[in-house]
Amino acid sequence: MVEIVSAHTDLRRQGVRYTGLCPFHDERSPSFSVQSEEKLYHCFGCGVGGDLFDFVIAIENVDFPTAVESLAERYGVEVKREDEDPQAEERRKARQRLTELMERTASFYSSFFGDAPEAAKAREYLAGRGLGEEILKDFGVGFAPSAWDTLLIKGQQAGYSIPELLRTGLAQKNNKGGVYDRFRARITFPIRDARGRVVGFGARATRDEQKPKYLNSAEGELFHKSEILYGIDRARGPMAKAGRAVVVEGYTDVIALHQAGFTEAVGVMGTSITEAQIAMLSATVDTIVLALDADAAGRKAMLRAQQVAAGRSLRILVVAMPAGVDPAEIATAEGGAETFRELVDAAVELPEFHIELVLAEVDPNSPQSRDKVLGDA
C-alpha cells in the first residue's frame, strides 16, 4: 500500500506507520497516515480513510471493479471472472498481450534514449528545453532507433507476431505489403490511459527532413486520440486535490509543468479539445484552465471548448498566453513556476475571453462593430 500511496504524496516512516501531506486536500502540515501492516490509511485533517481499494477508488475516481483490475494489472495478478464466455476471454487476453507489448516497447525506447549514442542529440535537445533527467524518466520519454526494423525484430524475438505489431500501430505496411517500424529516429512519449496502461506513442522528429514534426500512433484497438489526455494517469490524483485541471497542447508542455509543480496538467496532443476529453475531466474536476498557445488554432480550440462543454456544470477559465511562447518555455525559464502561476491566477472566464476576442477583431469606429459584437458574443 505504501508503494501505491507514495505515487501520490511523499511519505516518511515513523515507526510502523508512514505520514505525509494528504493527497485529497491542501495542507501544510502532514496529517495523512498509512498503516503499512494493516494496509489502511487515514487523514486526520479531512477525515478520509479506508483500505487500499478505497484509496484507489478515491484517488483515481473509479468504481470498485475498475480499482480491482487496475491493481491486478499493476502486480501481474489475474482476476477470475465468473461466467465469462470463451470469446470474451480470448478478446481480453489478446488485448492484454497488446498492452504488454506496448509497455515493453516503452521500456525499450526509454532505455535506448538514456544509453544509445544515436540518441545523444535528442538528450541534448530536451536538456536545452530545460527538462531534467528525472522528469524525463518519470514520463518514460524515449527514443526510437533509426533502423527500419529494430522493433520488428525485437518484437518477434520476444514472441509477438507481425499482426500484433501492426494492431498496436508500432509497425505499418508500405504500398508493396512490406512491414516496417512506424517510429524511427524520433523522440518518443508513451501515452497512457487513466489506469496507467500504454495505449500509444507520440513521436517528435529529430531531423529536418522528417515529416510530420509530430507523429502519433495510428488510431486502432488501443489508441483513440480523441478519448485520451496525455498525462492523465499522473494528473488525476493532483487534479482531484486541486479541484481543477490545467489543459495544454503538447507533450513537453505537460512534462515542463509537472516539473514546475503543476501536476494537475494534462495535454490534448494538439489544439482541439473533444467531448470525450471534457467528459473525462468533468468526472474529476469542476474547473478547467485552458493554457493553449496564443495563435489562431489555440484561440479556436478554446472557443470550441465552450461548445463541447455545453450542458455540463463546468467552469472554464482561459489563460492569456503571451504570443509566440508556449507553457513549456514559461515553466522552464528562471522564475517560470511563479510566472505561470500568475498567469493562471489571472485567467478569465471563457465567455469573457470570447468577448475580448470579438472586440479585438473589430474596428471600434465602424458602425457595424456593435452589431458584430452582439452577434458573435
Indicate residue ranges for each PLM-predicted region.
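C-terminal or mid-to-C-terminal helical accessory/interaction module adjacent to the motor/catalytic core
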Residues: L314-A377
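Conserved active-site segments centered on acidic
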Residues: T66-K121
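Phosphate-handling DNA/RNA-contact segment within nucleic-acid enzymes
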Residues: Q14, Q87-S107, P145-I288, M302
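N-terminal structured subdomain of primase-like DNA metabolism proteins
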Residues: M1-D85, E89, E334
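Structured, non-catalytic alpha/beta "coupling" segments that mediate domain-domain communication
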Residues: A58-V77, A185-A205, E329, A333, ...
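Terminal amphipathic helices with adjacent charged low-complexity linkers/tails
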Residues: D83-E84, L136-K137, V141-F143, A147
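Acidic beta-strand-to-loop metal/phosphate-binding motif
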Residues: F53, A245-V247, V285-A297, V319-A320
